[in-house]
Amino acid sequence: MGAPKQKWTSEEEDALRRGVRKHGAGKWRTIQKDPQFSPILSSRSNIDLKDKWRNLSFSASGLGSSKVRVPKITGSSSSPSSSSQALLLPAANNVTEAMLPADADKKPRDGKTPPKYGAMIMEALSELNQPNGSDIDAIFDFIKQRHVVQSTFRRFLPSKLRRLADSNKIEKVDNFYRLPDSFATRTPAQIKVSDPKQKDPSKASKTIGLFAASSPALEAAMAAAVKVTDAEAKAHDAHDQMMEAERMLKMAEDTESILTIAAEIYDRCSRGEITTLVPVAQREF
């Protein structure tokens, strides 16, 4: 077994950040060979640099690889790396500005769509009731006319529809969505025709007074519902952006590895050595 890994020092972390700013993420061998950083990072391998940079990126954004977390607010720090973190990850501010509820940071990993948006989509498909299904634009227009939604709702609506389709709650036919045939369509109960009863005017006035007295509470409840909807939308949007950033980071790392292998093959061929390439399973991005 090799020697145990030593804990990263603040000097090494700062050198890694400056190296990424100078050469870019994924250029680990280039950073190691740079005379400006090689004396400090001499005890670290390119794998160490890659893993440490990923940890720094996630900690700077306040997000993990699979969950959207609410960053904890702490006292001001005099660390010189705070400005570099803000420079490297400007998109993290968009997440921390969102006032998330206590349970908004729980990403539905089990494929469940939040009840509010799921109910909106099911209502839209039920009301539109197209035999061949409705497209995303038609569903969005219907929901926007009946509900107060966040400005980015149209952007993450396709992911909501895919989750519902994966859980067999709705069906996807080409680019259209519809309710499954097993969905029980609700029909209003038959209304009995009878002579209208004369209502008591005093009871009607009491009802009107009750709603008038409770109007501030209703307004507060509506405002709270709008804020919760906005927070949920921002949480899902932030998670999608984080997953895309992680995917791009993996692609950059794989590209760096391929370039390194190509350079080694070129060096061997230049020396007249015979190099044999063994095919491996293709990795999906």
Curated annotation (Swiss-Prot):
Q: Where does this chain mainly localize?
A: nucleus
Task: Offer a single GO CC term for the protein.
Answer: nucleolus
Q: Where does the record say this protein resides?
A: Nucleus; Chromosome; Nucleus, Nucleolus; Chromosome, Telomere
Which residue intervals are the DNA-binding region? 28-56
Q: Name any one Pfam family assigned in the record.
A: Myb_DNA-binding
Under Gene Ontology molecular function, one entry of this record is:
double-stranded telomeric DNA binding
Instruction: Report residue spans for region: Disordered.
Output: 1-35
From the record, what ranges are coiled-coil?
Answer: 226-255
InterPro entries membership:
Histone_H1/H5_H15, Homeodomain-like_sf, Myb_dom, SANT/Myb, SMH1-6, WH-like_DNA-bd_sf, WH_DNA-bd_sf
| Claim: Cell inner membrane is one of the keywords in the record | no
**UniProt keyword annotations, A-Z:** Chromosome, Coiled coil, DNA-binding, Nucleus, Telomere, Transcription, Transcription regulation
The residue ranges of the HTH myb-type domain are 1-60
Q: Is Ligase there in the keyword field? A: no
Biological-process GO terms, alphabetical: nucleosome assembly
Q: How does it assemble?
A: Forms a homodimer and heterodimers.
User: Record's domain comment?
Assistant: HTH myb-type domain confers double-stranded telomeric DNA-binding while the H15 domain is involved in non-specific DNA-protein interaction and multimerization.
Q: Which family does it belong to?
A: Belongs to the histone H1/H5 family. SMH subfamily.
Q: What does this protein do?
A: Binds preferentially double-stranded telomeric repeats, but may also bind to the single telomeric strand.
- Tell me the protein's name: Single myb histone 3
Task: Report the source organism.
Answer: Zea mays
